[in-house]
C-alpha cells in the first residue's frame, strides 16, 4: 500500500512532495477508486515525477490493466513519458521484497538521479 499513499501524498501535498516511487502499485483496492482520485487530483506536470512498475507473477499480474489506465490519466494531464513519469513492466517479478530489492535502483535513478 506504500505506492498508493505515495500517490496520495504527491496529490495532496504537491508543495512538499516532488515525486512518488510506486513499486508494485496495488491498484485494485477499492475497485480502482485510486484511479478516479488520481484523475481529479493529479498536480500540474513539469514539477512532479511518478515512477510505476509491476511484475508479471503473483498478485502483480493483476496490475497491468489498472496501470495502463493510470498511464492514460498521466498522459492526458500533460505528463511526458520517461520525463515526468515512467512505467515499467518487469517480466518474472512478483509482489515481494526480494523482487523489489532487485529493482529498487530503477525508481531511485529516475526520481533523484540521471535516468
Where are these regions (language model features)?
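Non-catalytic cap/lid and distal C-terminal segments of serine-dependent acyl enzymes
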Residues: 1-115
Amino acid at each position: 500500500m506504500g505506492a498508493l499513499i505515495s500517490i496520495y501524498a504527491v496529490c495532496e501535498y504537491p508543495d512538499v512532495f516532488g515525486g512518488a516511487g510506486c513499486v508494485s502499485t496495488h491498484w485494485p483496492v477499492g475497485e480502482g477508486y485510486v484511479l478516479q482520485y488520481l484523475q481529479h487530483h493529479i498536480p500540474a506536470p513539469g514539477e512532479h515525477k511518478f515512477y510505476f512498475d509491476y511484475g508479471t507473477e503473483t498478485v502483480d499480474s493483476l496490475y497491468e490493466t489498472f496501470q495502463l489506465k493510470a498511464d492514460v490519466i498521466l498522459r492526458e494531464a500533460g505528463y511526458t513519458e520517461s520525463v515526468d513519469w515512467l512505467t515499467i513492466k518487469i517480466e518474472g517479478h512478483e509482489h515481494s521484497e526480494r523482487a523489489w530489492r532487485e529493482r529498487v535502483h530503477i525508481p531511485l535513478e529516475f526520481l533523484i538521479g540521471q535516468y
